[in-house]
Amino acid sequence: MQPLPVEFYARQTTLVAKELLGTLLVHNSDEGITVGKIVETEAYLQGDPACHAARRMTPRNSVMFGPPGRAYVYFTYGMHYCFNVVTASEGVGEAVLIRAVEPLKGLELMRKRRGRERLHELCAGPARLVQAFGITKEHNTKELTSGPLYIAVSSEPSPEIHTTTRIGIKEGADLPLRFYIKDNKFISKK
């Protein structure tokens, strides 16, 4: 599987968020390989009140201001990690949250990591997919164009995309920056 090049990420964030739909999230860990089709994303933009980089650069969000095509993994609600992809130009401070993935390969490993059997419960939500794929804070700042964690080109045709508002935020909740593959049963919420 061919990783997406850095140029893919170095573009307008909402475009990247849409075009990530249908691509493959791949993690080749010591435990085994997991692969899933990205089916739901959210864009977080400079000046967007819900974006971690909206106010200023901090040690936590500094990766968002770095080169595109890197992982931004952060801890939220004191219990879960979330996986984002840094986008746009260096210095901008934007990213795409990967909200849901359709599990394709490494299902038994995903079930073991999640402690769940039902396929829909493995990766339908940002915290679930991070756990199922074994993504940790150690992946923060890592390049997604090479290495064990990457996003790959898919041979499937471009999916039909549905656009709506983001989930689980207060500020910027009215912005239409959530994208998902229409009629896909593995999205986190309709």
From Swiss-Prot:
The scientific name of the source species is Desulforamulus reducens (strain ATCC BAA-1160 / DSM 100696 / MI-1) (Desulfotomaculum reducens)
Q: Which domain of life is it from?
A: Bacteria
Name the UniProt key words of this record, in alphabetical order. DNA damage, DNA repair, Hydrolase
Top EC class for this record: hydrolase
Gene3D superfamilies per record: Methylpurine-DNA glycosylase (MPG)
* GO molecular function (one): alkylbase DNA N-glycosylase activity
Q: Which family does it belong to?
A: Belongs to the DNA glycosylase MPG family.
- Could you tell me what this protein is called? Putative 3-methyladenine DNA glycosylase
Under Pfam families, the record lists: Pur_DNA_glyco (PF02245)
Q: Which terms does the UniProt entry file under GO BP?
A: base-excision repair
Q: What is its EC number?
A: 3.2.2.-
